[in-house]
Amino acid sequence: MKGTLRQRLWLADGMLLTVALIWGSSYAVAKQALLFYPVLGFLAIRFGLTFVLLLPQLRGTGRRALRPGLPLGLVMLAIFLCETSGVMLTSASNAAFLISLCVVITPFMEWLLLRQRPHNMLFLACALSLAGVWLLTGGPQLSLNLGDALMLAAALLRAVLVCLTRRLTAGREILALALTAVQSGVVAAGCILLGVSLPGGLPALPVEPGFWFGTLYLVLFATLFAMFAQNRALGRSSATRVSLLMGSEPLFGAIIAGLWLGERLGPMGWAGGLLIMLATLCTLSIGRQPAPSTAGDGAPARA
């Protein structure tokens, strides 16, 4: 019996570590895909494919996701416009570290929107993350470029999305995949409308295999497999182990960006990234502890 439980624990940990690795690699993959097609077209294809694959989830009780999914999809549209444009304009390493700030920002957004005061330790995590951003963006020679600013905006919007998801889905039985389907449809439709309204519209679909391999990787692995693996593993691993494994995502992002794209972070950049990771791990470990009053597990799916 103990051997079986240990095997299940290792399997759960392996799945969570795989998800962190996939999500960490997604920044470099997206950066490469954007070499072949503009942001709006790339997002329209990526989320259009996700919507088509998840469409069966909207049958029966899945339709309950329509009402909350539409406004949440609009927020998600803003997130990915900022995030994907940010990935294009900054390094994949910076993008991976900066977007993880949403974990630290979320408790303070809950304080603002849901009137839930954060744990005192989270103020320390916030200070660590701010120091990390300062080091990551140049330290004394602060050079926050447009891409970094867009990634920070995306992190802030992700925190807003978490709070809105909890508020709009509280007390409702809504399938996570159905909610992701609606949100993906809204993002795809929004990008198509924005794209065709611009002068010249969207260019012809790219023919480069690298674009399609990258896009399919993001759809099949960064969204569908990641959701399956995360849902299957979360109930089998301890909160501390989950926090440590999922908090490794930005580290994987920086390593993959270095190996694949040739990006190099200096000592100051690595110090800043590690401070952000430390703040993220602190927030995750505190956030997973039982509390007398919670808003429920309404965090939106990563797409």
Model-derived features: positions:
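C-terminal-most transmembrane helix of multi-pass membrane proteins
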Residues: 1-5, 9-10, 43-48, 211-213, ...
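Juxtamembrane helix-entry segments on the extracytoplasmic side of multipass membrane proteins
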Residues: 8-12, 35-40, 44, 61-66, ...
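Specific transmembrane alpha-helical segments of multi-pass solute transporters/efflux pumps
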Residues: 22, 26-27, 55-99, 106-109, ...
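Hydrophobic/aromatic residues within transmembrane alpha-helices
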Residues: 33, 42, 86, 91, ...
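Helix-helix packing/entry segments at the starts of transmembrane helices
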Residues: 43-45, 81, 95-101, 164-188, ...
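Transmembrane alpha-helical segments that form core, pore/gating elements
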Residues: 51-54, 106-107, 143-201, 215, ...
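C-terminal transmembrane-helix exit sites in multi-pass transporters
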Residues: 53-61, 83, 102-124, 251-271
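Hydrophobic transmembrane alpha-helices of multi-pass small-molecule transport proteins
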Residues: 54, 70, 76, 118-138, ...
